[in-house]
């Protein structure tokens, strides 16, 4: 199914064509859509073939925890769309971010992260990783390049940020972060969930690793949970620290769990993702199910046209909200006058995605009343699908954060997150308008 030759053919095609055809090419009399391989095991007829699997000398499958042909096709498609050299799917976006850090960090290491990130990521970095002995230091992503570089320590192993902060909508200066990471001799890892490769491909601006919650725009229909890591193939894992020691021995030194195999020597520009699957997916079991891979793959086939409509609707809704007397403020990088408009135009010229944040005059109580009066728009703990949805992050996605931490993450107590769907633009605006009018 698919294969290397077909992937090379697809790289010469335009983005829209890659969305539709991706990594899969049906043979004669075979299904047009990717098949769902719902099997835990794979049969072999001699011990040698199985031994090759355990030594990572064969691309075939042996056990569903380590992947399946259906999941493989999604991984290849995500890598193709992001312009990467390899992809690796996980059970969720949280899992994708976690293993991207664990792949290169261990107890005693240090990570630098932009402060304006998804609440779940903030807790993962600030609480769970700290318990594992990995310190994540948060900082203002708008700091000058030299100030960011100055935060590095000898044990710093990664620089992390989100293309579009969730839900602050701060636009990450990708080239600045890439330059900072190069100066620190660490990989730049960026979560591209909100922008998607339809609007921004961070690897083109110097990112080394791209992560996704495919649960959002990639799937696009609210049907499947998943995550993905895409490797840029543009980082030298043999880099050494000031003392001449390897900074990333997990990739560039012998691995004790594979009889001394050196992942970077053997797999080159696919070393990061290969180790993710061979070690972390193997050990942690955060595997994507074949059905979720299938549904996400189906969603990706319409990614380009969906994002175009999300952007069109969002821009119209933003113009409506900015002029409504009951709206106190609005943050949408696609809106002229927004603080991050110029950065959005630079990195996302086709549009700043379909998510925005705004505040209703009257604060938190007024915001809650607004939500209760919506009829078409849904109150759900989700973004990035075909339905227009709203949420109050301070009491939901960022609820575990202290008030001080919420403010630091860009979460105003009255902030409303709005994910604009694919309904008729006028219908969306009419529903928002009638709910706002009832707050007066």
Residue ranges and their predicted role:
Residues 83, 155, 326-329, 376, ...:
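Glycine-centered tight turns that cap/initiate beta-strands
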Residues 4-6, 126, 135-137, 154-157, ...:
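PLP-dependent enzyme catalytic core of the Aspartate aminotransferase-like
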Residues 284-293, 298, 302, 307-309, ...:
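Conserved small-domain helix->loop->beta segment predominantly found in fold-type I
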Residues 230, 357-359, 419-421:
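Short hydrophobic/aromatic beta-strand micro-patches
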Residues 8, 16-28, 86-323:
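Conserved PLP-enzyme active-site core in the AAT-like
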Residues 46-95, 120-128:
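Conserved N-terminal alpha-helix of the aminotransferase class I/II PLP-enzyme fold
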Residues 1-16, 322, 437-440:
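Basic/polar N-terminal segments that are highly enriched at the extreme N-terminus
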Residues 6-68, 76:
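N-terminal "arm"/small-domain region of PLP-dependent enzymes with the aminotransferase-like
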């Amino acid at each position: 199914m698919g294969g290397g030759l077909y992937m090379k053919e697809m790289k010469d095609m335009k983005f829209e064509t890659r969305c539709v055809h991706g990594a899969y090419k049906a043979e004669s009399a075979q299904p047009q859509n990717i098949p769902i391989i719902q099997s835990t095991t794979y049969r072999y007829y001699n011990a040698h073939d199985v031994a090759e699997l355990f030594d990572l000398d064969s691309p075939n499958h042996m056990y569903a925890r380590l992947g399946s042909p259906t999941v493989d096709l999604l991984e290849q498609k995500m890598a193709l769309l992001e312009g990467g050299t390899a992809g690796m799917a996980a059970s969720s976006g949280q899992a994708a971010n976690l293993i991207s850090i664990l792949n290169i960090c261990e107890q005693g290491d240090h990570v630098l992260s932009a402060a304006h990130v998804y609440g779940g990521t903030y807790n993962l970095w600030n609480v769970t990783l700290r318990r594992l002995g990995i310190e994540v230091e948060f900082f203002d992503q708008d700091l000058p390049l030299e100030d960011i570089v100055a935060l590095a320590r000898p044990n710093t192993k990664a620089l992390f940020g989100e293309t579009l902060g969730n839900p602050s909508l701060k636009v990450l200066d990708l080239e600045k972060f890439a330059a900072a990471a190069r100066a620190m001799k660490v990989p730049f890892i960026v979560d591209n969930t909100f922008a998607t490769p339809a609007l921004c491909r961070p690897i083109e601006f110097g990112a080394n690793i791209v992560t996704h919650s495919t649960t959002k725009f990639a799937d696009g229909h609210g049907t499947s949970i998943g995550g993905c890591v895409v490797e840029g193939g543009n980082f030298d894992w043999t880099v050494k620290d000031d003392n001449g020691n390897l900074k990333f021995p997990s990739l560039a030194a012998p691995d004790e769990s594979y009889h001394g195999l050196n992942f970077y020597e053997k797999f080159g520009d696919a070393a990061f993702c290969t180790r993710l699957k061979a070690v972390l997916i193997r050990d942690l079991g955060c595997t994507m199910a074949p059905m979720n891979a299938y549904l996400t793959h189906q969603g990706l086939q319409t990614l380009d046209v969906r994002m175009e409509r999300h952007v069109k609707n969002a821009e119209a809704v933003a113009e409506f909200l900015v002029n409504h007397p009951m709206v106190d403020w609005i943050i949408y990088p696609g809106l002229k006058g927004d603080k991050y408009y110029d950065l959005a135009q630079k990195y996302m010229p086709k549009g700043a995605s379909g998510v925005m944040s705004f505040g209703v005059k009257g604060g938190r109580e007024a915001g809650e009343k607004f939500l209760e009066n919506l009829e078409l728009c849904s109150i759900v703990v989700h973004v990035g699908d075909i339905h227009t949805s709203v949420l109050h992050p301070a009491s939901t996605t960022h609820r575990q954060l202290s008030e001080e931490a919420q403010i630091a993450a860009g979460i105003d107590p009255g902030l409303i997150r709005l994910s604009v769907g694919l309904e008729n633009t006028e219908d969306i605006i009419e529903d928002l308008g009638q709910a706002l009018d009832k707050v007066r």
